[in-house]
Regions:
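Glycine-/small-residue-enriched transmembrane alpha-helix faces in small-molecule transporters
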Residues: 1-47, 77-80, 88, 133, ...
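Loop-to-transmembrane alpha-helix entry segments
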Residues: 69-75, 102-105, 121-141, 145-155
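Specific transmembrane alpha-helical segments of multi-pass solute transporters/efflux pumps
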Residues: 30, 35, 67-105, 113, ...
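Juxtamembrane helix-start motifs in multi-pass secondary transporters
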Residues: 48, 179-185
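Specific alpha-helical transmembrane segments that line the substrate/conduction pathway
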Residues: 47-50, 54, 90-123, 161
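Membrane-interface helix caps and helix-loop-helix hairpins in membrane proteins
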Residues: 91-96, 144-152, 174, 200-207
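C-terminal ends of transmembrane helices
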Residues: 59-70, 110-124, 166-177
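Hydrophobic transmembrane alpha-helices of multi-pass small-molecule transport proteins
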Residues: 4, 60, 82, 114-117, ...
Length: 217
């Protein structure tokens, strides 16, 4: 490889890393503001999830440049995991405060470290172990302060969402499945289950709820 090619390769790596950080920041901002949007939608959590996923499906298809999907085992497993993560988070926002839900979901790095060690047999670095210990202590104090039944259930669902997000992160990295593809299948799964919930508990549609759902998507 010539000097020019090496310089170009290094520049591309820097740009790629910067882009990844930008996506992480945008994701954090999106998740952090989702909790407030949920409060404007007084629907069944399954219906909320289905409505936002319906919009998300088209966004993912456009970003991917194709709406074709393979319903292979890796894709279906990823779709189920993604659906479960989203549904737990939506339900948590209905049963506890938005701040509680997002803080507990953001414990997922701790579970990434634990699952990498337990399942993938990857040795954790010292800083990862320290981070995990601090987060575990924080969670313990958090639940000691939130003993009311309603909040406790919501907090547990938010914690489950964090665990499932960690599983989803590792699955996306090591399964070899197309992340956007199984994300689209997850959207279809959510819409199908949400359609059944609409029959049993029809939502009251308002302009505010529609704007909030589009924002959530």
């Amino acid at each position: 490889m010539s000097g020019t090619e090496l310089e170009y390769s290094e520049r591309q790596a820097v740009v790629g890393a910067a882009r990844a950080r930008l996506y992480l920041i945008l994701t954090a901002v999106g998740y952090s503001t989702m909790g407030a949007a949920f409060k404007f939608v007084d629907w069944n959590p399954l219906v909320i999830s289905a409505a936002e996923k319906m919009f998300a499906f088209f966004c993912l298809g456009i970003a991917r440049g194709s709406f074709k999907m393979r319903f292979s085992r890796p894709v279906l497993l990823g779709a189920v995991c993604s659906y479960a993560c989203t549904t737990c988070f939506v339900a948590a926002n209905k049963l506890t405060t938005a701040a509680n839900a997002i803080v507990l979901q953001y414990t997922n790095p701790m579970f990434v470290v634990l699952l990498s060690w337990l399942v993938l047999r990857r040795r954790a670095q010292r800083r990862d172990i320290l981070l995990t210990a601090v987060l575990m202590g924080g969670i313990a104090l958090f639940f000691l302060d939130e003993l009311s039944p309603g909040h406790l259930v919501g907090n547990l669902l938010a914690l489950c969402s964090g665990i499932l997000m960690a599983v989803n992160t590792l699955y996306a990295r090591y399964s070899g499945a197309d992340v956007i593809e199984y994300g689209m299948v997850s959207c279809l799964l959510s819409v199908g289950i949400g359609a059944a919930a609409v029959i049993t508990e029809p939502p009251v549609v308002t302009a505010v709820s529609l704007v909030a759902v589009v924002f959530l998507a």
